[in-house]
């Protein structure tokens, strides 16, 4: 596991991110000590048992397709399928790994297709994805020509799922670090920062937006995707307890309110690029995610509402400049 992080340290040592090395190694060492008491050791065993295969065919431009069935023996493919299944649930994807189709809960490729026409080209950029899950979008960012891609997410499982994919496509310019946003110093070095599906989980959304801005170089672009509701700049939903069965949802603003928040913390040229209702085809139970999904979170008699009676999930994409 240390080699994952050592590779990252070496990659940033001579870059505008080098000052991150003042704090990052100690943070990750602390994480390793904490994580060793949970499920991480069993997932590390899964990773160690993945077969060594020379991957020749990779497509991360139109999808995340790593390898073809012919590059593995039948035995290796069965072994890989068994091991990847042990890392369930798989939430963000889909992935194709040497003919194994990982049909994830979310069709994250649909979100990517919605936002891609609206963002600045990623070619040659240094990119950060905050709350990146198991890293599906990291690969798509790299596929668009980003020079260096970093994702952060505090989940041990997401880290190991990412490393399982990277095992078959060992790209030294795509990395995932098991950190929350609160662990980031003011790096002010990224050309583009993505935050998708995180804002409503933060108790202080204004502080969170300021943290996002602090990661961008002057003139860099924020791509923000989050839950919103209909209304004017004074409209914000604060659930009394749960929203769509989630306890950790704190603030769901209207797009107008969110735009105002972003401007208050200093973002410029804030633009609302897309609004889309989350459909039952985009988020659903699959053979790779057998727990409850969106259909279980909505009112069975009126899918325009959550099971608690709030408006059903509506997701917006906004862009802004630091």
Swiss-Prot record:
It comes from Pseudoalteromonas translucida (strain TAC 125). Carboxy-S-adenosyl-L-methionine binds at residues 92, 106, 111, 131, 153-155, 181-182, 196, 200, 315. The gene is cmoB. It catalyses: carboxy-S-adenosyl-L-methionine + 5-hydroxyuridine(34) in tRNA = 5-carboxymethoxyuridine(34) in tRNA + S-adenosyl-L-homocysteine + H(+). GO terms for molecular function: methyltransferase activity; transferase activity, transferring alkyl or aryl (other than methyl) groups. Homotetramer. This is tRNA U34 carboxymethyltransferase. GO terms for biological process: tRNA wobble uridine modification. The keyword Oxidoreductase does not apply. Keywords: Transferase, tRNA processing. Belongs to the class I-like SAM-binding methyltransferase superfamily. CmoB family. Catalyzes carboxymethyl transfer from carboxy-S-adenosyl-L-methionine (Cx-SAM) to 5-hydroxyuridine (ho5U) to form 5-carboxymethoxyuridine (cmo5U) at position 34 in tRNAs. Its EC number is 2.5.1.-. InterPro entries: CmoB, Mo5U34_MeTrfas-like, SAM-dependent_MTases_sf.
């Amino acid at each position: 596991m240390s080699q994952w992080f050592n590779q990252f340290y070496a990659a940033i040592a001579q870059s505008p991110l080098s000052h991150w090395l003042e704090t990052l190694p100690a943070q990750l060492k602390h994480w390793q000590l904490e994580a060793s008491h949970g499920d991480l050791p069993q997932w590390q065993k899964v990773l160690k048992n993945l077969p060594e295969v020379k991957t020749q065919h990779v497509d991360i431009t139109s999808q995340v397709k790593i390898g073809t069935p012919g590059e593995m023996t039948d035995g290796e493919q069965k072994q890989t399928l068994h091991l990847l299944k042990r890392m369930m649930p798989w939430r963000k994807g889909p992935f194709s790994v040497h003919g194994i189709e990982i049909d994830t809960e979310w069709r994250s490729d649909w979100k990517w297709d919605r936002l891609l026409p609206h963002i600045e080209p990623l070619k040659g950029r240094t990119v950060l994805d905050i709350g990146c899950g198991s890293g599906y979008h990291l690969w798509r960012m790299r596929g668009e020509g980003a020079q260096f891609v970093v994702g952060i997410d505090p989940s041990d499982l997401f880290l190991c799922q990412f490393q399982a994919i990277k095992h078959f496509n060992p790209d030294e310019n795509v990395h995932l670090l098991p950190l929350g946003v609160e662990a980031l110093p003011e790096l002010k070095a990224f050309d583009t920062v993505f935050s998708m599906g995180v804002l409503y989980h933060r108790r202080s959304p204004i502080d969170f937006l300021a943290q996002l801005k602090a990661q961008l170089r002057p003139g860099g672009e924020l791509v923000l995707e989050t839950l919103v509701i209909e209304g004017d700049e004074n409209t914000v939903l604060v659930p009394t307890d749960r929203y769509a069965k989630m306890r950790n949802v704190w603030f769901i603003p209207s797009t107008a309110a969110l735009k105002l928040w972003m401007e208050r913390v200093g973002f410029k040229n804030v633009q609302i690029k897309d609004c889309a209702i989350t459909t039952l085809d985009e988020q659903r139970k699959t053979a790779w995610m057998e727990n409850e999904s969106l259909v279980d979170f909505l009112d069975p008699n009126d899918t325009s509402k959550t099971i608690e009676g709030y408006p059903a999930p509506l997701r917006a994409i906004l862009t802004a400049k630091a």
